[in-house]
Amino acid sequence: MGNNNEFSSGKCPVMHGGMTSAGMASKDWWPNALNLDILHQHDTKTNPMGQQFNYREALKQLDVQALKDDLRALMTDSQPWWPADWGHYGGLMVRMAWHSAGSYRIADGRGGAGTGNQRFAPLNSWPDNVNLDKARRLLWPIKKKYGNKISWADLIVLAGTMAYESMGLKTFGFAFGREDIWHPEIDTYWGSEKEWLAPSGSEGSRYSGERDLENPLAAVMMGLIYVNPEGVDGHPDPQKTANDVRVTFARMAMNDEETVALTAGGHTVGKCHGNGSAANLGAAPEGADLQEQGLGWNNHTTRGIDRDTVSSGIEGAWTSKPTQWDNGYFDMLLGHEWTLTKSPAGAWQWVPIQIAEEDKPVDVEDPSIRLLPIMTDADMAMKVDPTYRQIAERFRQDPAYFSDVFARAWFKLTHRDLGPKSRYFGPDVPQEALIWQDPVPAGRSEYDVAAVKAKIAASGLSIADMVSTAWDSARTFRGSDKRGGANGARIRLAPQNTWEGNEPARLAKVLAVLEPIAAEFNVSVADVIVLAGNLGIEQAAKAAGVAIEVPFAPGRGDATQAMTDEASFEVLEPLADGFRNWLKKDYVVTAEELLLDRAQLMRLTACEMTVLIGGMRVLGANYGGSKVGVFTDRIGVLSNDFFVNLTDMSYTWKPTASNLYEIRERANGALKWTASRVDLVFGSNSILRAYAEVYAQDDNKEKFVRDFVAAWTKVMNADRYDLR
């Protein structure tokens, strides 16, 4: 008989089997290893809905009016476990939606409201999101009722929009279409600080120089959505805060007028909570005990709800009527002089020096009690900064104009990462086309594709020219905010036609051939660019002995310069493209990490990234015709030579510069090829080498071609939401 006492004595019955939480992971031992996990997020193993679930089809079954009615009713259905301020949850729901959308940054398109990521770490436990877990829990009965017909991502934004409507704002519209994720995003860089709300100059600070905020970040501190409401690093100074506000909102794709509108509109309703001590709050949701059931910041010491709630630490309302949409914010801010004080929680805030009793907001529980209104340092920035002040004065004089600007800015804020209008769904989608949506007119889908392809084939363009141009047109796609891609052919417009990475001189030469073909057949240049790339691949595959037709879906349109916000598109400029073995300059981040980031934005898997690299090298598609990484003597043949030679132990590899290596014959030291870090990582990284070995095998020459074509087609069609 075995001795079972070891279990009863408290020893772990699974011993050292599956690792659930404890133990060192590979990343702990080798922290500089390439993190390929960012390419394998949100797959079917984490999604409880299964592969067959189609959210857009489920939306067609949604009773939108009933849902909106239920949300309206929720606003005034105060719950004893988390009572509504003044009997109205409007301010709370607005803050939830604002903070969901406000994490978006234009530099890489990550963050934002498009995935329901506020439900997961780290956002669900950010200091700036204190008590938003209560808002989502208040929404749960509605989510439960409508089930699969409404995503959390859509519901969070709609709740904020309906909150405004219930308080009197005429909103600009709303679009469904945001699909939920089911675990935390691991590709988003939120900063390097080691503690929440770490001030400038702390370890891993996001600031350098005078006050230069690290790209792609928009928020000023780890754990904040935008700026510190108490002032820069917690030190009140409205003009310095105004500078932070301007940078942060610009990185959220907002101009000065939209910034003032969003600040004022967000603070027209609701209040700040700081009537108590933050020391009495429990852990954030991610660190809370099991019995808290996903709720954080619980106060088991004092009352902790209603007028005694603590969230930001600032205490008070901005306006006299915090559950009503009006122009009171500007009257309050601009009509009074303000002085600094501290809240009961010890946070810096501004209060009026003198104010009439009837202009004070009432207590959230007892309307017979009136309290001083407050302003944050960010609010005071709207008064002190000359540009913001001028805009605020105009809004004060023209309430209708303010309401319209805010409604449009709110729509932009909450839809910025939803992508093109073709992804919008629902009865309240605005008809007006907005330039920040990167509009593209519909193209022809019925025409003689074979005839167009034949004309391209007779044009004299090389395989490298056709493939490179199509790739450059499509590689701007970002799955984060659904921007970029080949549709629209913006590669022929400013600013893309002058980007260094697009080789403007070569691009102009190729477009001079393709544009007349598009005109002759009355089809889009966008289609012709992609079709030319496909043709080049077919020719290269044929040369490799594989007959294959690259799938092509006509119907792309051509954008115009007037449809293109040049400044907005500047952020899509590639600073590196490992697929074409190009770096604009040397960066602190390694070339292979830049490749990985681009692959993730393009929504490629590690296998797809691998096969595309191998194919692009042998096609001669390197930037400037460079031979770096071209491990073949048969350029223009879609062979697996890159992988065959990369994995061949007949060679040695030696560094010669920061991003350059020589590959020499082991037997005699003769130079055979040169390579970049991007090339050699496919032989160095154990996972990527495993993929490279698959494509180097003698029996996988045709598999390589077919996998390359599949990955290529995915890239060319990444922005074709009309095909889904």
Curated annotation (Swiss-Prot):
GO terms for cellular component: cytosol. The lineage of its organism: Bacteria, Pseudomonadati, Pseudomonadota, Gammaproteobacteria, Enterobacterales. It comes from Edwardsiella tarda. Signal peptide: none annotated. Binds 1 heme b (iron(II)-protoporphyrin IX) group per dimer. It is an enzyme of class 1 (oxidoreductase). PROSITE patterns: PEROXIDASE_2, PEROXIDASE_4. There is a cross-link at W98-Y226 (Tryptophyl-tyrosyl-methioninium (Trp-Tyr) (with M-252)). Gene3D superfamilies: 1.10.520.10, Peroxidase, domain 2. Heme b binds at H267. This is Catalase-peroxidase. The gene is katG. Formation of the three residue Trp-Tyr-Met cross-link is important for the catalase, but not the peroxidase activity of the enzyme.
